[in-house]
């Protein structure tokens, strides 16, 4: 895995690349196009594979939930935009994606995967990296899975909600926090209010 330039608490590496958009058209997009929104940017190894469509379809099917949080989901792989489009145009029952609600970025030169530190150089493909970038373009969360295991849309949604909550309220979120759960005031005395309720 490459070391990359993606570091928590720092600006996420910008990119400009061709994507297949939800309307089926090709469009050059940049990360900077989404400034003012949260972004979930995830990499997957290859089009026309096995775990990848389950993840991409799961994120696409729930794109509206992310949109309600002012969050854009973007997928990326090293395949060409033509390959992405062919996969989108292949029916789900034949291993395709079907219509998408999220852009799929093409990274054939592997520069974006390299920048984000998810390039599996010996195979020229990406590990399953997922990056949460806040509305100021700052990288807040990184997860990287090895190739055989897919990611959880529920957990990604929870993390976006948690980061947005801490941004807005200045309180911190304990393990497993979900909207409506108790949070912790980051102060030695005030935090006791949370801990005093624990069993």
Curated annotation (Swiss-Prot):
Gene: PRDX1
Domain of life (superkingdom): Eukaryota
Lineage: Eukaryota, Metazoa, Chordata, Craniata, Vertebrata
Residue(s) carrying Phosphothreonine: 90
Residue numbers carrying N6-acetyllysine: 7, 16, 27, 35, 136, 197
Listed PANTHER family: PEROXIREDOXIN-1 (PTHR10681:SF111), THIOREDOXIN PEROXIDASE (PTHR10681)
Active site: 52
Protein name: Peroxiredoxin-1
Classification via Gene3D superfamilies: Glutaredoxin
Primary location group: cytoplasm
UniProt organism field: Homo sapiens (Human)
Molecular function in Gene Ontology: cadherin binding; identical protein binding; peroxidase activity; RNA binding; thioredoxin peroxidase activity
Residues found modified as N-acetylserine: 2
